[in-house]
Structures are given as structure tokens and as C-alpha cells.
Amino acid sequence: MIHALVYDPKKRTWSRKWRSFPNLIFDRCRIQRSKRFEQLRRFRSRYAHLNYLNRPLRDKWTIYQILLKKSRFRSHLPRTLMFRSTADVFNLLNDYPSIYVKPINGTGGRGITRVEKLSNDMYLIQGRKKNRRIIPAQKLHKARLSAFLLNWRGSGRFLAQQGIQIKLPNGRVHDYRMLVQKNGQGEWDVTGCAGRIGAPRSVTSNLHGGGHAVMMNSLLAQGITGEERRQEVRRTAERLSLEIAAYLEKTIGALCELALDLAIDKNGHVYVLEVNPKPAREVFIQSGDSEAYRRAIIKPLEYALWLHKRTAAPSS
């Protein structure tokens, strides 16, 4: 038995009641160092036999390595290295004009630094601390940059990732949040995609960091000329997202939704920046796509109902 929160549709209130374990569990707890997450981890370990709609997704480095194994995805993955020493960072900067240094398990744009190479010995850094406070842009010599990065990393595990040119003419960064979910037929389906524009001086586009959401097509129009070409880019992004979702589910285990953070350059090439297993839905409300928001809420329930009927049906 569990002491569950039960919704009363007549009173429109929630209350605690003792109930037997549910037939299906939809895990929406975000990965974070907290007592609640530790409780969830112990629960999943103890009751591993229960039916979960989704399994925890692994860290960013592991997901990158999994996707890299499939040749279909390689051209869509920014080159990424584990930040084991500052040599990893400078090796990337030898090949790309800018890179991002990000925590292996970070969310919400926290703890991300952008490094741009200005000359052989001079670099421009910008970032966002773990509390989401923006670090103003500053120029550092190579030796000082090394010290800064080692202090920034501390005892944590970080990645160094190829930077993609995602600045708009006004200097703000942008990307796209693509949500794919299982539908009522048990198939992966595109729920929606919204554009995100970062706050002034921010190196990330996250909404919690001061960014705002817009409709995908209007943001694409700022960099891609021609409606036909924009639709082609959108179809490519959707097809890639669906293929990645199916591949990760096949490799890792049960999943019912994924949000992919995508960068699209001026040539229309799509890059996968991150894959998020427990995404928020507010990006669709903010962008004005209320229908995508409605679908984002309903689809997991429709998939759960389909899965329940399928597992409860007597085998022939």
C-alpha cells in the first residue's frame, strides 16, 4: 500500500489516501541531489518489478557515446569530449572557434561556460553559474583561462562541446525544444517544437534563465530563407528526433517521452545539443502553441491507457 495523493474531480482538490500500487508508474522526478530523489531511487530499486512508463536516462556523456555508435546520427552531434584536463578544452579550441563547457548532469543551463578563441593566447569567456547568475564576458590569457576552467569544474564532471553558431543578429543565442512522445497507439510521435531565445548576455536559451519561447517557424525565418526550405528543415528535425527516441528506447529501455534541444545553423543543418527525459511543457504555453501544450499533457495518459489494455489483455 502507498499513501497516495488522490484527485477529487468534483471538489477539484487533492488529498492523501491509502491505495494499492498502481498498474503503471510515470516517473517525472528530475535528477538532482535531494532527499526526494534519493527516496525515488530507493523506491525504484525496491520495486523494480512494477511497470514504469519510462526509465532514467543516463548522463550526457553516455548518451553522446550511445548516439555516436550509429552512423546516421554522427553528423548531427557536436563533437564532445570529457573535460579531464584543460588539454581537452584547448584541443577542441584548435578545431572550432568556440566551445561550451557544461556539467555532465546539469539542467536548466546551470554551470555552463562558453569559451571563444580570439587569438592564439587570448580567449573570451561568458557563462552562467549553478544558481543561474550570468557571468559577464571577460577576456583571459591562456594561463588564466586554464586556472579559471579548473576552478569552474572543481570536483564535478564536465564536458567540452563544439560550439554551434546560434547567435541571432541581435546577439542573443537561440535553439529549439522538440518534444516527442509515445501516443495512444504505442508509437513515437512529434508533439511539438518551439524556439527559445536567451536573455541578453546569456550563453543559454533556457526559460528559467530569463529566456523566452516563440513559435518554431517564426524563429526559423530569422535564419532560413524561403518557406519551402524552412518546412524541409523542420521535417528533418522531426524525423531525426523520432529516430533518436526509438534508438534510445531500444538501447536503454522503456521511454515514453523525450525532449531534444536542437541547434539549427544558417545552412539548415540540425545539431542535437542535449536529450532530456523529463521535460517541462511550459515552452509551448509561452510560445503560444496551446494545442501542443494540451497534447503534451494528454499523450502520456493515452499511451499509459494503451499499454495497460495491452498488458491486461489475455494472451491468445
Short names for language-model regions:
Residues 1-88, 107:
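Conserved N-proximal alpha/beta basic substrate-recognition cap immediately N-terminal to
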Residues 196-207, 276-288:
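Glycine-rich phosphate/pyrophosphate-binding beta-alpha loops
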Residues 5, 262-279:
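A short beta-strand motif that forms the metal-chelation/ATP-contact edge
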Residues 144-175, 179-263, 297-310:
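A long amphipathic alpha-helix within ATP-dependent nucleotide-binding catalytic cores
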Residues 279-316:
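Charge-rich, low-complexity intrinsically disordered segments
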